[in-house]
Curated annotation (Swiss-Prot):
Phenotypic effect of disruption: No visible phenotype.
UniProt-annotated binding residues for ATP: 73-83, 220-230
InterPro entries: GDA1_CD39_NTPase
Protein name: Probable apyrase 5
The UniProt record lists the keyword Transcription: no
Induction profile: By wounding and drought stress.
Gene behind this protein: APY5
Top-level EC class: hydrolase
Membrane side Cytoplasmic: residue ranges: 1-32
Active site: E196
Region ranges (Disordered): 1-26
Ranges per topology, Extracellular: 54-488
Cofactors, names only: Ca(2+)
Amino acid sequence: MDALKVQILPDNQSSPSSTHMLTKPKSKKATKSIAMLIVASLAITLGLLFVFSSNSVMFSASFLRRSSLHYSVIIDAGSSGTRIHVFGYWFESGKPVFDFGEEHYASLKLSPGLSSYADNPEGASVSVTKLVEFAKGRIPKGKLKKSDIRLMATAGMRLLDVPVQEQILDVTRRVLRSSGFKFQDEWATVISGTDEGIYAWVVANHALGSLGGDPLKTTGIVELGGASAQVTFVPSEHVPPEFSRTISYGNVSYTIYSHSFLDFGQDAAEDKLLESLQNSVAASTGDGIVEDPCTPKGYIYDTHSQKDSSGFLSEESKFKASLQVQAAGDFTKCRSATLAMLQEGKENCAYKHCSIGSTFTPNIQGSFLATENFFHTSKFFGLGEKEWLSEMILAGKRFCGEEWSKLKEKYPTTKDKYLHRYCFSSAYIISMLHDSLGVALDDERIKYASKAGKENIPLDWALGAFILNTDTPTSDYNGKSRKMIGFK
């Protein structure tokens, strides 16, 4: 029965007519309004219930994931500094899931590198202890004992004599044993350049979603570190066994060329060039001045206090380091000098072809990412993504040919010890990629990068090491998600 609105009427009005006018027409409006109100109320109630239930499910899933997170820590002991990486991961259907977003990944770098403690191994404990404390602040205390921590040293440490390496590693092992993390002495080690290249290749192709597919459609990596350079990719030609590694992903096997060119990292190569200049009679004016075409004009310095900062000079060269360097600032001459250095020993090549020295290198093919100092130098010059090698030549010529005083005015926030190196690095990059490895100046298949993929995953070899060192079953990853489930 419809609800009626009833009014008390004056005595002189006719109740039937008044009742008719008040009840019948307005009952439809009232009924419609009330019905709409009821429907709206029900809709709002159902909506709120849905939101609350959805949020509850999401909260529960998030809470369960956080409570079931596993953690792993890797310390990258590089030549210029030591960086700690803290990873969080979880399991789905019994398989680990890796996510390198900010919620599950953190890192911190401290300088100098562990190799700088060659004369004082105990000094290495200070930076490692600070890094360990950083990791502890990002992992629940109750999970420290179950979280593994590994230290992997690279080219800077590889350059040291083995006894010195072990002295430094023993100091770090002592710190890690008492850290509260899960640790074994063999987890602090000096890794090979080949392993470093493989790790970088893994994380790059994980980020790009190309793992599990055609090996020849994967992306290669060329890295320019401080002490070494790495070239890693899947070639189409036969590779001598000493230069190849095979890894399996799901049902796909990848035969990878990976080689580390020790002493050809940016810092080591610059010091090596200085050594060559010192030994060259033609480069010296005979009055204790050595001309350096890879340093901008107007920059004169004592080689021992300025150039030996990376610690890569030999003892014989350090003796000569009291010579004064006369900056010549000539990109073309610098390019020629660095190319001669890269080609030294090529006459002893025992393989089909050698691109750098007497080391076998397959013909470069497919897509590549140029990382580390390739990226840093390109960003410094503000190069575009296309034909950046051609742009590098122009930028290098301008920079090398500029007076030092003007460069300091143009780049006031860049420290001198870094600023003057961009002349060398621009010429060295061209000598390595174009003149030695044969990459065309207009080849758009090679790009400089520090991150890759839609999720901008850092192209850091330590991330690849984390993936490969995590105990994982065979993968069913389909290449479409940034989450990589199971790699072995």
